[in-house]
């Protein structure tokens, strides 16, 4: 698309969006909705980050997985930030200062990426600032979405609009636009442009009405009495512990942090009063989420070996973003009405089958079929993308059915931390595989073997399905389904 065409499309989109906003959105909701949009649109830097890691920093695939592990950990601390925002005001207010703090951290992180970052350690520090910033913004937006609603009807409206703005940001900025910007301007200018996103949140945050009343502590559950202080102290100690291990380059630091995280989350699950059946089901879903991937080694090879550039990778991301949303809409009802074990079975088997074209690309399947590598990659993305957003839905269904009365929000927060921890475990396993097969930018010869191992590993959790089915039978007796469940978020 030409520059003129992009300008015309942007102008038309802006006019249409403005008309729609005036009809459906109240002004006081905008800080929340713009926060969700900014988080969704933050994917605009994804392709720029890939080329920055590869070309500017010279990171090997195992190094990328090592960094991704640390970047996933802040999302397991959402509950701690939620407690802080609820019970420990900053500058006399409960929401606005935290929102501005989160936006400020992301702005500083992007500014460092755009200017001075030139080493892996500096890159990790800058990305942690960006990630922690978005995590804080996300927590505050979740809380504000409840506080701004005058009644249940308004709450449902805000939740639906939140999902719309989040997905709108992902689709609008996370694919073709991100690839085009990275190709046309380079990585650092894209990071500079991305500063606009948290800046929008900061400006919107100035219009949040002050919330000076400290929320009363609940009478039961993990936050009862003085337990909120314990959660805060433990969370801060955990963050300091992880940072210290990383800075001192302690051997097996990631494994130690993962183990400590699992113990902390397990303790919270025990305090909230989950049953054995729920715990078993959560552990099985954890196994499915923790399976390794090929990591950046495959993307690096596609760039070097197949000639995939920023623009084409942007197209793939755009197709995946749109069709993953379509898949969520089409399959959500089926998923929520069937047992979790059934959903995990068919999603896993389908995902394994649809992973085969990626392996085929490495071994020259496109040449054998007489089509270009880009055509096969685009076909594969089109077919497999609808499954991308489905793996978290079973956990949402499970939580909604089994959360102790009055502790639903706490249960969601703890389980979200557990699932984010599973993604960190996945990055750890990905690092192991890349190190074992010695995948580097100079040598991709063992990449095919790695991908075959990843395919096999994706099927291993199926062995735990009989255990999950027995747990589901217990849940059917103790927590009969009350209807379909929906959730307004599609990610962390």
Please provide the spans of the model-predicted regions.
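Intracellular loop-helix junctions on the cytosolic face of multi-pass helical membrane proteins
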Residues: 2-25, 117, 137, 150-294, ...
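Helix-loop boundary and gating motifs at the non-cytosolic
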Residues: 14-75, 246, 250-251, 279-306, ...
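Loop-to-transmembrane helix entry/capping segments in MFS-fold secondary transporters
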Residues: 61-62, 146, 150-162, 310-311, ...
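Glycine-rich segments within core transmembrane alpha-helices of 12-TM secondary carriers
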Residues: 75-78, 156-175, 320, 416-427
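Helix-to-loop junctions at the C-terminal end of transmembrane segments
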Residues: 77-93, 182, 326-346, 434, ...
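Transmembrane alpha-helix termini and helix-breaking/packing motifs in multi-pass membrane transporters
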Residues: 83-87, 114-115, 170-192, 245-250, ...
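C-terminal transmembrane helical hairpin of 12-TM major facilitator-type secondary transporters
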Residues: 342-394
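A late C-terminal transmembrane helix in Major Facilitator Superfamily
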Residues: 405-437
